[in-house]
Amino acid sequence: MPTTTDTPISPATATMLVRLEKYVLPIICGFLAWQRLRYLQQQYTAWHFVNSHPGMSLFAPRVFYADLTKNFLIFAIQAFTGLTLLSNRAPAVLPDKLKHVMVPLAASYYMILYGLVGYFPMSMQQSMLPDAWRFPVAMAALACSIIGYAIAVWAIVYLRRSFAVFVSVRDVVTNGPYRLVRHPIYCGYLLDAAGLLLAASSVGMLLLCCGYVVLLVCRARMEEEMLAKSDPAYRHYLARTGFLFPRLASLAG
């Protein structure tokens, strides 16, 4: 029996949703990018104030610059996403099922749910790490997030006008990071999720990250199914590239 998300959508509805993707989602991305830019400014102002008053410095410079880099990459992703959505090509094949819209939207804005960790029981919020491990693990978490966001920005730059939120068919990109892996943007997002999980090291964050992984994998599989159905050459691409992470043979070649 088909589920609710398998419900077909009409071409007229799909066209309206694609227009929403092109003209409304960029506004949301622009707002998020502007908010991140304001946060970066506040972060720098606070750092400058602390360092201009001897004895008030709380963080090592390397930690501050790493966190600043991470937040700049988040800003870059949000800005690039909005710009690429505005300039993307019309899809050759429109989304034809409700899941092609709902799953990508849920995956794209799932990060909002990370704030729910604060409403979990205290036992699910507490870090499972010993005190002595927390700082080095936090640094590893920051590194994971920076690498993840850098990979995502790199992939969006190569995807350009083929970038989309909803599952549809546009030109297949096979150069840059796509030469090694079919979903480098999602690879980057998963590394960021790993960073969040390491930073929190709590049961609550583990549950939320597991939900995010499921959504990303479902989204990627739907994209591949639609592309393989519409483009025979994509099947050869499937055979020689990794899903979310590069194959060892691809790296050796």
Predicted regions and their residues:
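Solvent-exposed interhelical
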Residues: 170-188
